[in-house]
Amino acid sequence: MKVFQLAIIRPQDRETAQPPTLVLSLANQLDSFSFFQRSSVEEFMRFFATTIAERTEVGQRQGITQENYVGYVYRSHARLSVVVVTDKEYPEMVAIELATKISREFEQQFSDAQISGATGPVSFPALQDYIAKYQDPHQANTILKVQRELDETKAVLHKTIEGVLERGEKLDSLVDRSNELSNQSKMFYKTAKKTNSCCIVM
């Protein structure tokens, strides 16, 4: 599971086509590609991210698959989209959560006027931290972390319950047999119980 790119994008207005689409901040994690492929891959992912950012409605969250990649986009308002580009195995819930988190944090740091008036990339170092942290979605997302722990506990509990059921089945078969036993057998059980308790005392 990999996060390849995080992009904060100001999409152009569809009606006026102004201001032009601008990548405000970008972080890449392309170590899984060869050195010679990285610039082409980054360029393709940037194009992919800007394209889906422009075509996402305000307030919408969605995932778009392109070959081996998925672009998860959240467009918080007309001037801001966040795109998380991952491989297909990456959990959708975590990617959407990350896009939403980045969007909120970016909007706290930059005003609408700063976003609208930007003419080039802006400094947002948190993006590098997020791309490093979210490489392991189970550690980054507390819900997934708790879910994994619950799954592990559930597996242990299933084994324990299965063991109890096996014993329970044996006890049930004994109970069934005891319903078939006569009073004479019950007296034998009581006598044996007394004898065993007598022997334990000695």
What is each stretch, according to the model?
Residues M1-D172, D176-M202:
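Acidic, low-complexity cytosolic segments
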